[in-house]
Amino acid sequence: MKKSYSGGTRTSSGRLRRLGDSSGPALKRSFEVEEVETPNSTPPRRVQTPLLRATVASSTQKFQDLGVKNSEPSARHVDSLSQRSPKASLRRVELSGPKAAEPVSRRTELSIDISSKQVENAGAIGPSRFGLKRAEVLGHKTPEPAPRRTEITIVKPQESAHRRMEPPASKVPEVPTAPATDAAPKRVEIQMPKPAEAPTAPSPAQTLENSEPAPVSQLQSRLEPKPQPPVAEATPRSQEATEAAPSCVGDMADTPRDAGLKQAPASRNEKAPVDFGYVGIDSILEQMRRKAMKQGFEFNIMVVGQSGLGKSTLINTLFKSKISRKSVQPTSEERIPKTIEIKSITHDIEEKGVRMKLTVIDTPGFGDHINNENCWQPIMKFINDQYEKYLQEEVNINRKKRIPDTRVHCCLYFIPATGHSLRPLDIEFMKRLSKVVNIVPVIAKADTLTLEERVHFKQRITADLLSNGIDVYPQKEFDEDSEDRLVNEKFREMIPFAVVGSDHEYQVNGKRILGRKTKWGTIEVENTTHCEFAYLRDLLIRTHMQNIKDITSSIHFEAYRVKRLNEGSSAMANGMEEKEPEAPEM
């Protein structure tokens, strides 16, 4: 059943009155309303706010929470409807409620004549302002929607998903509604008066008259309560509430209304996250470094060889200082002593805040005599005496806080560059002393040999060391892991080191170097193609200094300590056996 009302508008009492204007043509607007007859449905009722009834105007009404159930084209049609004039676009708008389940339905067509008035210029073609006197239409959705129609679903405010999460507004009083017992939707109308103090904010009825959607969004944001953190609901109450969209204007759907709900409150005093798994074990290295820099280091080096092999010069070149005995205590005439004299001199060297107490031990007269029998004994006695001194400091009841370390850490043995092989004196000395000290053999004045002679000479010395069982530093048995083994193998291949010493500086290609200048060129001491002094310096100072000290303390000194304690215990046992037991006194 279809009813048509043409040329009239429904008033507040339910009657239709005809609108006419002689000044302009009448525009006809049609609304198709589908009425569904349900046996349990209740007639729609109008609830007016009693607090606002006195100031209600006949032309100010608002449909609250109109959900656009269609997709983007429907929203664009509504947006264009609010922005265009009646002459430019007159389309058919269908207002419908939730779809009923009964197949039998009635369609009521309500036609409203809208009088058009020209503003400011009657002859100009432009947008015209028009007003709806009464636009109260409640309908239902047709079974088959047209593709060009805009469907507006009217639901209860309590069924909206957004309204269920929002508290009641503070500015607009809450509309008292009775609980719904059936599935039929109820229409709730709130009539809002136009505020006198804010003329720029239009009423809900004026949103259909104004072509600009900005006041609609401002009024919508005023009427809506302030967003608060949402309370999640497990199940929606109705299908229409889950599919509801913002109503009236398309830009309201594009603007996020509850942006404040998505943004979490930022903490002002937020601190950086703390790694609770960090313990701080790596700080022990810094602690050891500070302690070592306060205490300093000690390094004792001995040089052994015949006179004139450049022992003092090489020591000065190693540390780039005048630290040798001859440099510190020069003598006008120095004769070869009849017996080997052990002379040592100590220097305090500081570099980049690191202090080191360096002791250089010289052995003048070694191998300079005709009869060199047992010439190694004074040197071995000196080394053992330093071990004994350190041992006595350890066994004392009241030990010192820090025992002075005078033990010989390394012994540089100078081999003359004969080009043949090791002498019997060299073999005997290194065989005996390799068990009590770290021996590093070097070829003195290697610049007197050609490159081919140097290679053959080194091969012969290596063969002699292996045949006589002489173990020089770095020893294979003291390699801790594969990494140390790889590094030490490179040094073992270079033994004995062919070195050249010089304490004179020269300018070569704008660079200062240590070397020896001859008629045919300059020998650079630190150039690895000229000699192997740089490798010797790395072994003694830059890479293996601490390892040399550790082997001296844990291997050589421990062997001497065990031997001395065994001798002391055996001597004490022999003394106790010789004594007769005495009778105890009363």
From Swiss-Prot:
Pfam families in the cross-refs: Septin
Domain Septin-type G: 295-567
Residues with the N6-acetyllysine modification: K62
Location of N-acetylmethionine modifications: M1
PROSITE patterns per record: G_SEPTIN
Positions of post-translational Phosphoserine modification: S22, S30, S82, S85, S89, S96, S327, S332
Modified residues (Phosphotyrosine): Y278
Stretch list, region G4 motif: 444-447
InterPro entries: G_SEPTIN_dom (IPR030379), P-loop_NTPase (IPR027417), Septin (IPR016491)
GO cellular component annotations of the record: actin cytoskeleton; axoneme; cell division site; cilium; cytoplasm; intercellular bridge; microtubule; microtubule cytoskeleton
Cellular compartment(s): Cytoplasm, Cytoskeleton
Residue span of region G1 motif: 305-312
Residues given in the record as GTP binding sites: 305-312, 339, 365, 445-453, 501, 516
Basic and acidic residues bias spans: 134-151
Residues found modified as Phosphothreonine: T38, T42, T49, T142
Region (Disordered): 1-49, 62-108, 134-268
Biased amino acid composition, Low complexity: 1-14
GO molecular function: cadherin binding; GTP binding; GTPase activity; molecular adaptor activity
Subunit structure: Septins polymerize into heterooligomeric protein complexes that form filaments, and associate with cellular membranes, actin filaments, and microtubules. GTPase activity is required for filament formation. Interacts with SEPTIN2, SEPTIN6, SEPTIN7, SEPTIN11 and SEPTIN14. Interacts with RTKN and ARHGEF18.
Family: Belongs to the TRAFAC class TrmE-Era-EngA-EngB-Septin-like GTPase superfamily. Septin GTPase family.
Record's disease association: A chromosomal aberration involving SEPTIN9/MSF is found in therapy-related acute myeloid leukemia (t-AML). Translocation t(11;17)(q23;q25) with KMT2A/MLL1. Hereditary neuralgic amyotrophy: Autosomal dominant form of recurrent focal neuropathy characterized clinically by acute, recurrent episodes of brachial plexus neuropathy with muscle weakness and atrophy preceded by severe pain in the affected arm. HNA is triggered by environmental factors such as infection or parturition.
Function field: Filament-forming cytoskeletal GTPase. May play a role in cytokinesis (Potential). May play a role in the internalization of 2 intracellular microbial pathogens, Listeria monocytogenes and Shigella flexneri.
Protein name: Septin-9
Organism: Homo sapiens (Human)
Gene expressing this chain: SEPTIN9
